[in-house]
Design a protein with these regions (language model features):
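ABC ATP-binding cassette signature C-motif
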Residues: 1-197
Length: 197
């Protein structure tokens, strides 16, 4: 299937390992057993993995943690990106090895925003996040002008952000230009799912 600029694709499926593998393949972390894919020449990507522990094995502050991923080392620049994910004041001096799961996701999202990519791939971005952060993420993804491919078990997030649903099944996939709620109640989709199970 082709993904166009501005598509906000919810990648869904009964098997969360399959949706995670899909994101890992697109991000080059896993080799596909069949098939291939190709990004356009002007595409820049950023990826939020489902698991992020490997990114937080040091004792540096959040400022220093994010600074390592930036060409611009200026404190105000780094603080700005942490601030977008609701880190403020002395919070940016917190050690990265004592962060909660939600704080780690917020750091990873700050890192993604700093990359200024035009294609974002998010694997379960709302995991561990509090309601305020989910709302901030939801609003930023709704207004994001690039392409988004994401997996989320958060119904509201998926319904309000996605303009396209791709469901992975044991025997293929279903690609539908519908909202999540429209997709769920579509009888034709249910028939396709049964045929591909």
């Amino acid at each position: 299937f082709n993904v166009e600029k501005g598509d906000k694709v919810a990648v869904i499926g009964d098997n969360s390992l399959a949706t995670t593998a899909f994101h890992q393949i697109l991000n080059g972390e896993l080799d596909a057993t069949t098939g291939d894919f190709e990004f356009g020449q002007t595409i820049t990507t950023a990826y939020l993995p489902n698991e992020n522990e490997e990114f937080f094995d040091g004792t540096e502050s959040l400022m220093d943690w994010l600074r390592q991923y930036s060409e611009n080392k200026d404190e105000m620049f780094i603080r700005g990106f942490l601030g977008k994910m609701l880190f403020s004041g002395e919070e940016v001096l917190k050690k990265s090895d004592v962060l909660s799961g939600g704080e780690k996701v917020r750091c990873m999202l700050s890192r993604m925003m700093m990359a200024s990519a035009n294609v974002l791939m998010l694997d379960e971005p709302t995991n561990h996040l509090d309601l305020e952060t989910i709302e901030a993420l939801n609003n930023s993804m709704k207004t994001f002008t690039g392409t988004l491919m994401f997996t989320s078990r958060d119904h509201t997030f998926t319904e309000t952000v996605a303009n396209r649903i791709v469901e992975l099944t044991p025997k293929g996939f279903i690609d539908s230009l519908k909202s999540f709620d429209e997709y769920i109640v579509d009888g034709g989709i249910a028939d396709q799912k049964k045929a591909l199970s």
